[in-house]
Amino acid sequence: VANPTAVDGAFADALAAWGRLDTLFNNAGIGSFSTTIDEIPVQTWLDVVSINLTGSFLCARAAFKIMREQSPKGGRIINNGSISAHAPRPGSIPYTSTKHAITGLTKSLSLDGRPFDICASQIDIGNALTDMAQAMTTGMPQPDGSIRPEATMDVTHVASSVLHMANLPLDANVQFMTVMAPKMPFIGRG
């Protein structure tokens, strides 16, 4: 997703196959956790920014172009934010920074998309049990320095939430949604 040529090619293929684009779920992402800023290799920072932010920008840009030009115009771009954008984890500077930036991308897309019937929204997901989140069940660093297991939820709850957002008509939008395991640390995390 961080290669502009590959992204543009994928969207061109989708347009050729289906004739239009109604929804983009910007869902690619990687994490880098467990160290302080002075120990983060610059390449790690660049890798996380490249996938999480540049990749989301490139996909949104390609989708926006198609949605703006198709007839009837319009569509929906749903960005995968994160609870970490609002309540960071210890040692998560690259990941958290990109997720803050996704919120800015979402707000700007919402504003720029209005004249073209393009809705933008964001889902902030917390502790959905995927391969990326498996470590949460055995223990994650907490703000007090301890390592504790965290509650997780079935990833199908995320899927049904995204489908709800995607299925709305273009005269309605869920601007921001948070879906999370209710017993995970979030409110009062730090």
PLM feature segments, named:
Residues 1-10, 42:
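The beta1-alpha1 cofactor-binding region of Rossmann-like NAD(H)/NADP(H)-dependent oxidoreductases
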Residues 35-37, 44-49:
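Substrate-binding pocket helix/loop in short-chain dehydrogenase/reductase
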Residues 38, 87-93, 150-151:
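Active-site loop immediately N-terminal to the catalytic Tyr-X3-Lys motif
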Residues 60, 98:
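Active-site helix of classical SDR
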Residues 65, 111-114:
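Alpha-helical segment proximal to the catalytic Tyr-Lys
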Residues 82:
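Residue(s) in the substrate-gating loop at a strand-loop-helix junction
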Residues 122-123, 142-188:
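C-terminal helical subdomain
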